[in-house]
Swiss-Prot record:
Topological category with respect to the lipid bilayer: Single-pass membrane protein
Periplasmic-side segments: 1-415
Post-translational modification: Autophosphorylated.
Protein name in the entry: Tyrosine-protein kinase MasK
InterPro entries: Kinase-like_dom_sf (IPR011009), MasK-like_C (IPR049806), Prot_kinase_dom (IPR000719), Tyr_kinase_AS (IPR008266)
Ranges of biased composition (kind: Acidic residues): 527-536
Encoding gene, per UniProt annotation: masK
Domain Protein kinase: 25-300
Membrane spanning stretches: 416-433
Length: 646
């Protein structure tokens, strides 16, 4: 039986090596760049001609002055370095050179599981069942080691990966399986911890409790392993739908087809193992990843032990071909590279970061030009350390201006930095949708913001929770002028797990919007965001004329763009009522209830609710107009962070 055909051709193209010294290493080739770091194939040099292939993950220079980014980057290295297991990628060093932190990790000659599955789809066949099971068994054993890991005092660290998917399972030509990317892992040892309510990971593979922003444990990783197994067996993502809200609706309702309905030749026993791993309630899943691995191992030995299965390494070599295997496994020595590319490499060193027309994943899988599918998800992701703030588009968002120290005579209010914060939380008929985004006003510097607590709000309860709007303040005199929001959206965000979907937004005197695609597809991103990976297509931007058209399913992109249009007025609330702000930096949440006509009721949460800034935010939020939609109500909780600089 042939699976549905997928489209990710495996392409290769030569890149001129950099051959650029960096600390004790020589950077051979840039592989990818995202919102937090850039990835290089490198050589570690030693005495008497010693050299070893490694991978360098280097923090982007403009982030080195951001303590939160730096600490999370270091946290990732410290945690992953402790997890010494054959099925976990090994971290060799956390270092600092030329003003930037970097992580050195082992180089692996192989392919990620996602690319392996997609190539099988292109060839219109399934990956052999014994190979699929071996991948999931070994990955589960590596995760179990991480889940059980303790500190020096024997106290459990309660590690949860939170981002398991086929793209984070790496298969080597030597037959190893490695779990990648502990960049957003939850652990007690982390110095930068996230809160309950912060949603991290990829929607398509999340456990329901993770999607709700609830506390997660190892069973969330087991659920993600089950989803990965489902995809590997059927070439269908069980919760793939037309947009993010529909994905989360299916996930939270447990709506999926049994695997044997898609592939009848699957044994019933294997389907039972898979569905137990994907049980809706955590208590109904396997209690540990080891128990899941044991169940698969038992099935493999009882049903497939005599099938003459090809070893994993041999399968990969045949699947991708001898040329690909040779390129991955036989990287030329530095002497050979220098002799071959000496002049050209010197020219390549002058290129600006990110100027290369192609990108590769962490271990050298070359991406097609302009293809976000393969370029934007390296094996170990480059993730912003501000909780849940993705980098779905251009790679260099989120820089802040340095904050000078207060003067001795008291604080002088000169510049107010306001970040339209990182999370959107939509609830329609009790379904939580979540998209993280930022806007960068031309005259206001961005401040990394915390992410809202995710709560499902049923439509019938929304009015009661929001209540009547508070007393409105007269409109602030900062209405957007024509063309004033271009940078706000072009440099803004896209969607979580989601799409690299930026747009340039122009506003006429009446506030009617028109869009022009910004062409950011193909930029290296730290979150696997393509529609193929997440199954969520970006909703089109609609003008006010859309109110006369048919109603739509209100998507997160729609919400983001409408709020971006009112960004200037919202920012002015903080500037006008800065005396109401209790500290030099903080956050306030505003809840919007968007009725089916597109009109808004707003209410400020917390201690600023009755203040001038709170009332101003409500008034400006209620001026927003969204596309008419099919739901009775959609509730959006928007956190706004501010920072006052001298």
């Amino acid at each position: 039986m042939s699976p549905p055909q997928t489209t990710l051709p495996v392409t290769e193209a030569g890149l001129v090596p950099l051959l650029q010294p960096y600390g004790p290493y020589v950077l051979v080739r840039k592989l990818a760049e995202g919102g937090m770091a850039e990835i290089f194939l490198a050589k570690l040099l030693g005495a008497d001609g010693f050299e070893r292939n490694v991978v360098i993950k280097r923090m982007l220079p403009h982030l080195t002055n951001n303590p939160d980014f730096v600490e999370m980057f270091r946290d990732e290295a410290r945690l992953a370095a402790k997890l010494a297991h054959p099925n976990i990628v090994q971290i060799q060093e956390l270092g600092f050179a030329e003003g930037c932190y970097y992580i050195c990790m082992e180089y692996l000659a192989g392919e990620d599981f996602s690319t392996t599955l997609r190539l099988a789809g292109r060839k219109r066949h399934y990956v052999p069942l014994p190979v699929v099971l071996r991948v999931l068994i070994d990955a589960a054993r590596g995760l179990h080691f991480a889940h059980e890991f303790t500190n020096e005092a024997g106290q459990p660290l309660n590690v949860v990966h939170r981002d398991i998917s086929p793209s984070n399972l790496y298969l080597t030509y030597q037959g190893q399986v490695k779990v990648l990317d502990f960049g957003i892992a939850k652990a007690e040892s982390r110095l930068v911890n996230t809160r309950t309510g912060v949603v991290k990971g990829k929607y398509m593979y999340m456990a329901p409790e993770q999607a709700r922003g609830k506390e997660v444990d190892r069973r969330a990783d087991i659920f993600a392993l089950g989803v990965s197994l489902y995809e590997a067996l059927t070439h269908v993502r069980p919760f793939s739908r037309e947009n993010d809200l529909a994905v989360l609706n299916a996930l939270l309702q447990g709506e999926l087809k049994p695997p044997r309905e898609l592939r009848p030749d699957l044994p019933e026993e294997l389907e039972a193992i898979l569905l137990k791993a994907m049980a809706f309630k955590p208590e109904d899943r396997y209690p540990t990843a080891e128990a899941f691995a044991d169940a698969l191992e038992t099935f493999l030995s009882e049903h497939l032990s005599g099938s003459g299965a090809m070893p994993l390494g041999a399968f990969l070599k045949g699947h991708f071909g001898e040329e690909r295997f040779t390129e991955r496994s036989r990287i030329p020595t530095l002497a050979t590279l220098t002799a071959t590319y000496g002049g050209a490499a010197a020219g390549a060193q002058g290129q600006a970061p990110g100027a290369e027309p192609h990108g590769t994943n962490l271990y050298g899988v070359l991406a097609r030009e302009g293809d976000a599918t393969s370029a934007q998800r390296p094996g170990m992701s480059m993730r912003p350390s501000s909780p849940g703030v993705p980098a779905h588009g251009a790679a260099s968002r989120g820089s802040t201006s340095p904050e000078s120290a207060p003067t001795a005579g008291g604080r002088r209010w000169r510049t107010l930095a306001v970040g339209l914060a990182g999370g959107l939380m939509l609830a329609a008929a009790g379904i939580v949708g979540y998209r993280q985004w930022m806007t960068t006003p031309a005259s206001v510097s961005l401040v990394p913001a915390t992410v809202p607590v995710v709560e499902a709000v049923a439509p019938e309860a929304a009015a009661a929770q929001v209540g009547a709007p508070m007393e409105a303040v007269a409109p602030v005199g900062a209405a957007a002028q024509a063309g004033s929001l271009t940078d706000a959206v072009a440099n803004g965000a896209g969607g979580d797990v989601g799409e690299t979907d930026s747009a340039q937004l122009s506003v006429d005197a009446a506030g009617v919007t028109e869009t022009d695609e910004a062409g950011l597809a193909g930029a290296a991103s730290d979150v696997e965001a393509e529609a193929d990976e997440e199954g969520a297509d970006a909703a089109p931007v609609r003008s006010k004329k859309a109110s006369s058209q048919k109603r739509v399913t209100l998507g997160i992109d729609d919400v983001q763009r409408v709020v971006s249009r009112g960004r200037a007025r919202i920012t002015t609330c903080f500037e006008r009522y800065k005396a109401d702000l209790p500290s030099s930096q903080g956050e306030v949440q505003v809840q919007l209830t968007i009725v089916s006509s597109g009109k808004v009721r707003a209410g400020t949460r917390g201690p600023l609710a009755s203040s001038g800034v709170g009332r101003c935010l409500e008034a400006q939020a209620e001026r927003l107009r969204f596309p008419p939609h099919r739901d009775q109500e959609v509730t959006v909780v928007m956190p706004f962070s501010w920072r006052v600089t001298q």
